[in-house]
Amino acid sequence: MSIAIPLGVTTPDTSYSDMAAGSDPESVEASPAVNEKSVYSTHNYGTTQRHGCRGLPYATIIPRSDLNGLPSPVEERCGDSPNSEGETVPTWCPCGLSQDGFLLNCDKCRGMSRGKVIRLHRRKQDNISGGDSSATESWDEELSPSTVLYTATQHTPTSITLTVRRTKPKKRKKSPEKGRAAPKTKKIKNSPSEAQNLDENTTEGWENRIRLWTDQYEEAFTNQYSADVQNALEQHLHSNKEFVGKPAILDTINKTELACNNTVIGSQMQLQLGRVTRVQKHRKILRAARDLALDTLIIEYRGKVMLRQQFEVNGHFFKKPYPFVLFYSKFNGVEMCVDARTFGNDARFIRRSCTPNAEVRHMIADGMIHLCIYAVSAITKDAEVTIAFDYEYSNCNYKVDCACHKGNRNCPIQKRNPNAAELPLPPPPSFPTIGAETRRRKARRKELELEQQNEVPEENPDPQPQEVPEKVTVSNEHEEVDNPEEKPEEEEKEEATDDQENSAHSRRTREDRKVEAIMHAFESLEKRKKRRDQPVEQSSSDIEITTSSSEIVVGEETKTAAPESEVSSPVSNVAIPSTPQSTGVNTRRSSHAGDVAAEKPIPKPPPAKPSRPRPKSRISRYRTSSAQRLKRQKQAIAQQAELSQAALEEGGSNNSVTPPEAGNTDSSGENRQLTGSDPTVISVTGSHVNRAASKYPKTKKYLVTEWLNDKAEKQECPVECPLRITTDPTVLATTLNMLPGLIHSPLICTTPKHYIRFGSPFMPERRRRPLLPDGTFSSCKKRWIKQALEEGMTQTSSVPQETRTQHLYQSNETSNSSSICKDNADLLSPLKKWKSRYLMEQNITKLLQPLSPVTPPPPSSGSKSPQLTTPGQTHPGEEECRNGYSLMFSPITSLTTASRSNTPLQFELCHRKDLDLTKVGFPDSSTHSCADRPSLLNCNHPDLASHPSVVPTSEAGFPSRSGDGPQTLLRNSDQAFRTEFNLMYAYSPLNAMPRADGLYRGSPLVGDRKPLHLDGGYCSPAEGFSSRYEHGFMKDLSRGSMSPGGERTCEGVPSAPQNPPQRKKVSLLEYRKRKQEAKENSGGGNDSSQSKSKSSGAGQGSSNSVSDTGAHGVQGSSAGTPSSPHKKFSPSHSSASHLEAVSPSDSRGTSSSHCRPQENISSRWMVPTSVERLREGGSIPKVLRSSVRVAQKGEPSPTWESNITEKESDPADGEGPEPLSSALSKGATVYSPSRYSYQLLQCDSPRTESQSLLQQSSSPFRGHPTQSPGYSYRTTALRPGNPPSHGSSESSLSSTSYPSPAHPVSTDSLAPFTGTPGYYSSQPHSGNSTGSNLPRRSCSSSAASPTPQGPSDSPTSDSVSQSSTGTLSSTSFPQNSRSSLPSDLRTISLPNAGQSAAYQASRVSAVSNSQHYPHRGSGGVHQYRLQPLQGSGVKTQTGLS
């Protein structure tokens, strides 16, 4: 056969090995393409693969060519990559796929691609018309050009060009062939055969493909055998022993002649027996290189040997002249073929002839079959080698090329060919149901019938029934619609006839019309039956009809009566099929709803209108989803029609006797329901037309409106349901992501939506159920957002923020309903709405505060007494106790909870002075009553600690109550918190790591939260909880700190330990974003360390808290609390925050830190993935180390505190830093009370401290480096045996754990102090955290050793902690100190004087704290005070960060 060859390819010699790395383009594409396609299934790679891997060994390629008819990208690749032949791009070049999945090309590849693209453009321009015809076969059309591009791009550098090529031709094909292809396109989509028809019909396209195949193929030195062929061969060999002997002979042949052929495989035939000659521009033939005697082995036909059915998987072959496929059926009657389109040798150019001079014979060598071309007659040199047709050319729809002499008039092929061109058209008819032509013919037949029927009635003109004719017309139209085959042309014709008929109808008598209508009804029924038999056709026609009918409906809308009648008509649907024509679109659907029952007379619409819309609809049908919409709408309408049907049937049954005359073929009937005066006719028509009618009466707009209304109603339903509070972090994150109010604030970093999408992997039960268990968790839609925002502004006060927060954070398991009930009004509205409302309030008041669950809600700068938070918590704690939640869930507690839960909602509440005073009393009481729990006081009442400075009396009074109340609350909330936090934090991406570190460091995590709360100025139940945990739990946490789950326990969710893996994986973009943020933060020294902490994923924050916990978390729960990223929530941190809030600098720092936390919250909120941690672990720890070093350089040991202080104060002021340093030492001191009690525990279990520290380090907030330090910290804690000497033990632990991995950790340790003010403070404190932790430890040591509670004590504590810190940091934190100190130093340099002042102030605070909390010990007070100062500084840093 003549082979079309793309220009520019001189010889097939070019080894296609150059192409893709694979020897065989197909193999390359088949495997990589297939694999990648599966990988990139989203890009519809699967579509190509789908065809490609149909069990064919060469799945991708063979199917492609089969499917594409054209060489398909594979072939194109093969060819095109080779096309670049001269360029010979390494098949596997450095080019690779970027993470985006886009192919990155090397310069060579790029050049090649460009060249290829240009060449392809030129080629394809020639080929456009038909070249892709087969290429457009099912899969091509299935894949969008973009998809194709992806496929190629993904696979090989060359593939890109090929892809581009294919894509463009595809588009071109569509555009040029649209006219004729459009109808066929339907066919193509519906059936590959029709797609084939399209391609087959276009010889040009085929030629183009052949050209590609001609030049673009891979040289086959050996055959590729499909598994089926191999199996057949094995069976054959076993069954036929005779062949066993032949293999030797065949082997000889194979090794000699065949081998020789192989060696010569190049531009000319092997052994020079044959050579490829370019006969025409695009055709090559195989000529004898010399005179060949009879039975001479000319060449082996090599390629992909497969069973014929495999090759013809799609049955496309005979639609296209696949020139490079050899069919062979003489082997055991097994029909096999050799596909050499993309992988073959020169034998592929052998053409078929009616007078062949060679034949194909098979030889079996090595157990494999070889198809060889033998001369069947003497072949002279340069004579073309031809073989007989190995396929039934008479079945081909395309012009078959015969190699015989063109002058041969006897050539049967040539004789057949003239018809061949026509054949393509006939084949579509062969698929009458599918063929567009078939539809047209049917439509024409119907038209003819209708016309005839109409003519009959016209003979009996009756002027009166014009309305009735209209009805008839409607039914006719329905029929037309029913006929999917009816074409716009036919419609136009019908319209013309309709116009005539309309006039005629008026002349017809009622009886005639009735008769016609009845006839039409029967006809339509029959047609419907036929259609049902042809479901495929029906589906396509339905789409068309639906579109057209909808348009018609629009036309009818002008006539409201018609639509109504149509709606009613569904009843009579069954009766009258005649309506189907008009309802054709509705036919199948119309069956659901009666079509037009023209109860009301409607003026005939101009027939032209209906016809016009129909064509449009048909056109749009393929391009738009309007058809689908219409289907949906019609379905809805059908239902409605069914409802109305009953009524219509009642009325229509009376008139059901005669449908409007079917004869009325007014295609312009325009769905007019027969509104003839004759009720019977109307009813009959209605019943028959009902399907179409019900749909027609409603325009698209109407339908859409109804649909939207229904949809809206459905949406409203979930609102009625009580909100289900989910602690699942994924759900919360999703909710937060959806919150309109939060969306605006960068403060809220919710879990990446892709996390949410998959649900929390650690909650299989939750995973099973939709992440959004309630309608309340609906997707955030603009409309909802707008409503929420608008309503939120007006309705924000509708429900107490506390209550709302509770609902948000209450676990589904806990008393959701109770709290939800409270918010029923809000809950009635979509969750987003009330959330947005609440957030609006929050945004108005505290949107700047960090909203991430990890970050505490920043206390308002204005809120001067952390008590506000604490009191709020106290009441909430009570409420929580009632609700089964710990304080965390109380409205005020929800402040803390909010912080934990990523809800900034409670910030204001936290800062409410009145609440603080009252509620602080409660938490304070519990705290004080727990004298054994200095940690509780510290942890739970860092606020109180700060409060003493603010409201000494209330704080003094509250401590005892605080101890009692918090204990009770803690107990009550303990369970709640465990549940809530286990769920929330164990599963929250933020807490996943903290839980891992601090499962049993849950206290530290709580402490961390508490420090967050400190910033927030609240003692959350979590704080109390953490304090309890710190006492009772810290040991557990310490023990469990080693366990990843421990961190979750720290979260206040001891049960979360098994979920440490819950660190959510972050998308690459997110990861980069975080990393960049970390870098930016690191750029600011303290801020950088802070942001790093955030980047590390609050992980460092956690580590900071961990360090704190380790340093003083061991001492007390407060220390433990600070360890978690929630340090702010931790009591000690809370107290620090409260102190900060109390002191102007503190409050200022707090506000700043809140601002920063907001900035940082995004990073904190997102827990870095383990990979991210590993990636960032290097950079973040390095940055932290560098900052520490800088700080150390400024002040090796004392500088630690001063650096820390500076660092913390830097973010805020010179004052801030001083308070920070003093706060650090104070924090150490303050924490030492907490720590002290905890240290006592730790003394009991030094391991506990280390574990808690580890947990802290493990905390996701800390970041993985922190985690590893945390573990080392634990190890250190255990090793030093310093737990007894809490300060030293913690210091040593911090030092040990932080030495290298812990740089961030030590920084984090400082951060706990500095971090106390805010989650982010911990980051800024990262550098400081080392010193801070050390001072804390020192302070804790001093705390452990009775230290004056007076101001002098604070200074002493500070000095002790400083000295201790200095020692520890220099000893164990050298790196950390360096990393932390550098930032600290940077910070310090600015506010040294300020630091001194702040430090003094912090000491003063500490003194006041000690005064207020004498039982704690001045060290403890100092720590608190210092921490608050620190907090202010930290807050500042936090704010900066």
Swiss-Prot record:
In-chain residues carrying the UniProt-annotated modification Phosphoserine: 72, 829, 852, 1197
Gene Ontology, cellular component aspect: chromatin; euchromatin; nucleoplasm; nucleus
Disruption phenotype: Mid-gestation lethality due to severe developmental delay such as vascular abnormalities in the embryo and placenta, reduced cellular proliferation and increased apoptosis. Defects are probably due to a widespread impairment in the regulation of gene expression. Setd5-haploinsufficient mice display altered neuronal network connectivity leading to autistic-like behaviors. Haploinsufficient Setd5 cortical neurons show reduced synaptic density and neuritic outgrowtho, with corresponding decreases in network activity and synchrony by electrophysiology.
Bias kind Acidic residues: ranges: 450-461, 479-501
Listed GO biological process terms: cognition; methylation; negative regulation of transcription by RNA polymerase III; regulation of chromatin organization; regulation of DNA-templated transcription elongation; regulation of synapse assembly
SUPFAM superfamilies: SET domain
Chain segments carrying region Disordered: 1-28, 156-202, 417-683, 793-816, 849-883, 1036-1228, 1243-1441
Name recorded for this polypeptide: Histone-lysine N-methyltransferase SETD5
CDD domains associated with the record: SET_SETD5 (cd19181)
PROSITE patterns documented for this protein: SET
One MF term in the entry's GO annotations: histone H3K36 methyltransferase activity
InterPro entries named among the record's database cross-references: SET_dom, SET_dom_sf, SETD5_SET
Biased composition (Basic residues): 165-189, 611-621, 1062-1076
Subcellular location: Nucleus; Chromosome
Domain SET: from-to ranges: 269-390
Pfam families, alphabetized: SET
Class in the EC hierarchy, top level: transferase
Catalytic activity, EC: 2.1.1.359, 2.1.1.367
Assembly information from the UniProt record: Interacts with components of the PAF1 complex (PAF1C) such as LEO1, CTR9 and CDC73. Interacts with NCOR1. Interacts with HDAC3.
Feature: compositional bias, Polar residues: 190-202, 575-588, 652-683, 1144-1163, 1265-1275, 1319-1333, 1373-1382, 1389-1412, 1429-1441
Keyword Transcription regulation: yes
Physiological role: Chromatin regulator required for brain development: acts as a regulator of RNA elongation rate, thereby regulating neural stem cell (NSC) proliferation and synaptic transmission. May act by mediating trimethylation of 'Lys-36' of histone H3 (H3K36me3), which is essential to allow on-time RNA elongation dynamics. Also monomethylates 'Lys-9' of histone H3 (H3K9me1) in vitro. The relevance of histone methyltransferase activity is however subject to discussion.
Summary of the tissues where the protein is detected: Ubiquitously expressed.
Catalytic activity as recorded in UniProt: L-lysyl(9)-[histone H3] + S-adenosyl-L-methionine = N(6)-methyl-L-lysyl(9)-[histone H3] + S-adenosyl-L-homocysteine + H(+); L-lysyl(36)-[histone H3] + 3 S-adenosyl-L-methionine = N(6),N(6),N(6)-trimethyl-L-lysyl(36)-[histone H3] + 3 S-adenosyl-L-homocysteine + 3 H(+)
Compositional bias annotation for Low complexity: 539-552, 561-572, 635-650, 1087-1107, 1250-1259, 1284-1300, 1335-1372
Source organism of this protein record: Mus musculus
Positions of modified residues (Phosphothreonine): 855
